[in-house]
Amino acid sequence: MTDLTACAHLNDYAKRALSLMDLTTLNDDDTDEKVIALCHQAKSPAGNTAAICIYPRFIPVARKALREQGTPEIRIATVTNFPHGNDDVAIALAETRAAIAYGADEVDVVFPYRALMAGNDKIGFELVKTCKEACAAANVLLKVIIETGELKQAHLIRQASEIAIKAGADFIKTSTGKVPVNATLESADIMIRTIRELGVGETVGFKPAGGVRTAEDAAQFLQLADQLMGEGWADARHFRFGASSLLASLLTTLGHQSNANSSGY
């Protein structure tokens, strides 16, 4: 492959990746102003991101900012049972209902991965199923974060993926971005293969999150999805990137100046 061809291919992947981003800020020092700035970045010179991902309390501010800048179609995702992944179903449900009441389009709930590691394969199903029922009633998408970097072992990653899917997850997501090891190609391979093997590729998507920082990183994940699921599967209904610093790299690759955050998640 020539350098020119390689560059053209990377540009193609960069364009795809940008349209699949859940542009994220989930920091303790987040403010209304930072969330509004994130909304502005989501309307990039190379096109809009699929969504933004923020804490629930900022949803009304973000909704107003997206509407005022003429991009009401950018979806708003938020997080619940985050980042700890506790096994209290009632609290996870209450947080999910609150997120829906704030106006979330999508909820990313953390699976009780520690319970699974301790041998409890029932509570995760109950938690996801309960949150899914609340989301489905409000036409809200549910993504389930299984925290692959903590599960570590392939059989646990597969088991958590399977439980989440069978309990009704619309997406399975690698990571919170709050642990040392986040999205890896190895965990992505296991999770996408699980989607394929369960025959749910039409209805269940995949989201790598944390650690996807460059256009080259994004291209590798998209190549994997294309190989396992066929070209065309990885659209915004079936594939998202959870990231913040990735946007700056994508814009640079596409020849745009960027004021996007180039550090972090």
UniProtKB/Swiss-Prot annotation:
Task: Name the pathway it acts in.
Answer: Carbohydrate degradation; 2-deoxy-D-ribose 1-phosphate degradation; D-glyceraldehyde 3-phosphate and acetaldehyde from 2-deoxy-alpha-D-ribose 1-phosphate: step 2/2
- Which key words are in the record? Cytoplasm, Lyase, Schiff base
Fetch the InterPro entries from UniProt.
Answer: Aldolase_TIM, DeoC, DeoC/FbaB/LacD_aldolase, DeoC_typeII
User: Which top EC class is named for this enzyme in its record?
Assistant: lyase
SUPFAM superfamilies, per this entry? Aldolase
Query: From the UniProt record, which GO molecular function terms apply?
Result: deoxyribose-phosphate aldolase activity
Q: Which reactions fall under this protein's catalytic activity?
A: 2-deoxy-D-ribose 5-phosphate = D-glyceraldehyde 3-phosphate + acetaldehyde
Q: Name one GO cellular component term.
A: cytoplasm
Cell compartments where the protein resides = Cytoplasm
Q: Name one GO biological process term.
A: 2-deoxyribose 1-phosphate catabolic process
Which Gene3D superfamilies does this UniProt record tie to the protein?
A: Aldolase class I
- As recorded in UniProt, its EC number(s) are 4.1.2.4
The annotated active site, in chain numbering, is D108, K173, K207
Q: What is its main location?
A: cytoplasm
Q: Which Pfam families match?
A: DeoC
Report the sequence similarity comment from the record: Belongs to the DeoC/FbaB aldolase family. DeoC type 2 subfamily.
Q: What does this protein do?
A: Catalyzes a reversible aldol reaction between acetaldehyde and D-glyceraldehyde 3-phosphate to generate 2-deoxy-D-ribose 5-phosphate.
What is this protein's name? Answer: Deoxyribose-phosphate aldolase 2
